[in-house]
């Protein structure tokens, strides 16, 4: 049985936001998805929100503050360190992958370009969130 997830999507491209939202819609599961579109709004959003995400989807190329800096902030303090972060970006540069994984990202995924890719992404996100809930 699939579980509904609390997801924070940090993405500045409205078209990608729409694709992610469509992919995260499931006939049997209604995920709660919050969207933040600028890097400088992420931490204030998390601090003020009454809903704690079970997984964060983070683009690297964001306005105001780069995704790598956001990841560093999230993983350096106690408040949000335990929330799994999945990097979703067009970059596949080895330096970006290494930096993000060393900084505490759960997974680094190049943005899908088709519906099948987004469906696989939803499966990965669900597995990561469920693993963390079980103490993984």
Regions found by a protein language model. Name each.
Residues 4-24, 56:
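Conserved acidic segment of CheY-like receiver
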Residues 35-55, 119:
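Acidic, metal-coordinating helix/loop segments flanking the phosphotransfer/catalytic sites
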Residues 58-59, 89:
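Active-site residues of response regulator receiver
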Residues 82-92:
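A short, hydrophobic beta-strand element within the central beta-sheet of small alpha/beta folds
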